[in-house]
A protein has these predicted regions:
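A structural-propensity feature for long, helix-poor, extended segments
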Residues: 148-193
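Active-site-adjacent structural elements in folded domains
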Residues: 69-75, 85-90, 100-111, 119-125, ...
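Flexible, glycine/charged-enriched surface loops at secondary-structure junctions
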Residues: 48-54, 79-81, 95-102, 132-135, ...
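Glycine-rich, mobile lid/loop segments that gate access to catalytic sites or pores
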Residues: 15-95, 105-106
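Conserved phosphate/anionic-ligand binding catalytic regions in large, soluble enzymes, centered on
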Residues: 36, 97-99, 109-141, 170-184
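Amphipathic alpha-helical interaction surfaces
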Residues: 40-43, 93, 124, 128, ...
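Single conserved hydrophobic/aromatic residue that forms the stacking wall/gate
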Residues: 1-14
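Cytochrome P450
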Residues: 142-148
């Protein structure tokens, strides 16, 4: 919800700015937004899972390290921090071919505020054929675990999956809407896990 006086104030500032200088305000907004994301994400996690009060950032930690710190999960060996560095880097690299990146780029191309651009991308990410697919995959894995009372053996899992496919349902999280080969992000996560 935008306060009218701020909207008018922002417009007054932008009117005195040459179009060739818009990048300065955009850069400033972008840096501010990126700086706030770890605290925002960690705060949502802590609120959603009743983990207590907000944890303040640590100025001695990097972007991923602060996210891990503010979530509040133990990370004595630093593996969670390294995993989050990898995860965030791999998911920040989107050229514009998917829904969230395309929506963000489209809104930004109208010289909209970076906050609106990121919001557009997040709204696209919420769809079942994009980011929500990750949640559907996790639900599927947890439902398999519940059905079998733990991790099923290979044969039971194979029968369960074939039964699901033969009934016309999909197995969430497998395959990619665009790629026709292994997702390189998946390969990077497997390599990290094996180390």
């Amino acid at each position: 919800y935008a306060i009218p006086s701020r909207i008018v104030g922002s417009e007054m500032c932008i009117r005195d700015r040459k179009k060739s200088d818009y990048w300065e305000a955009t850069l400033e907004d972008g840096v501010r937004l990126l700086a706030k994301l770890p605290a925002l994400g960690a705060g949502v996690y802590r609120m959603r899972f009743n983990k207590g009060d907000r944890i303040n950032p640590d100025v001695n930690k990097d972007w991923a390290g602060n996210f891990v710190h503010m979530i509040g999960l133990p990370d004595k060996d630093g593996n969670f921090h390294r995993l989050m560095q990898l995860y965030l880097m791999l998911h920040c690299d989107h050229e514009g071919g998917n829904v969230s990146a395309f929506a963000s780029h489209t809104v930004a191309s109208a010289l909209s505020d970076p906050y609106y651009s990121v919001s557009a991308g997040l709204n696209g990410l919420a769809g079942p054929l994009h980011g929500l697919a990750n949640q559907e995959c996790l639900k599927f894995v947890l439902s398999v675990k519940d059905k079998f009372g733990g991790v099923p053996n290979e044969e039971d899992l194979k029968q369960y999956c074939w039964s699901r496919l033969e009934s016309g349902r999909v197995i969430p999280g497998y395959g990619h809407a665009v790629l026709r080969c292994a997702d390189p992000r998946f390969s990077a996560f497997i390599k990290f896990g094996q180390q």
